[in-house]
């Protein structure tokens, strides 16, 4: 009986505590998002192996495109679209070096999103050319992932490869 009573009082107290909590406000969330985006821009990854076109940046750009769209739509702020466009131009809209490696085409997700917005063919041509080359020259790499054997990375045998390349091909399909 005491346990039941104690449980009931505890549940009742938790309901009152939750009712007094103030939920996040939209302006507060946007302010935090802006701070994070600004921090990311001001603090680029220092390691040379993670340059503009490497997969960590590709993942960052995917989120930045979403933030850029929100910032422009709600605040008339195109800062983030401009930042992404500078990166694309600086790299001639090219994906990274390894043709078959899923990580190296991840940046194209944002380039294709920018193409969808601006309709500048320079933004899509390198990704389209890379894709056509891959279709015409299928990988002969193994499906067995072998540490240190780069040829086995051609077949996307690791789980996050599904985030890196397939969205590029799906977007490219929708755009062409």
Predicted features by range, described:
Residues 36-48, 152-153, 164-175:
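Active-site lining segments of carbohydrate-active enzymes
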Residues 76-113:
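Mid-chain, structured segments of secreted extracytoplasmic proteins
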Residues 44-47, 95, 118, 138, ...:
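Alpha-helical junction/boundary sensor with strong preference for TPR arrays
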Residues 1-21:
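Bacterial Sec-dependent N-terminal signal peptides
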Residues 20-86, 121-133, 142:
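Low-complexity, Ser/Thr/Pro/Gly-enriched N-terminal "stalk/linker" regions
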Residues 41-42, 85-93, 141-152:
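Acidic/His metal-coordination segments adjacent to aromatic residues that form catalytic metal sites
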Residues 53-69, 100-116, 157-174:
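Well-ordered alpha-helical segments within folded domains of soluble proteins
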Residues 124-163:
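Asp-box/WD-like beta-propeller blade repeats and closely related beta-sheet repeat scaffolds
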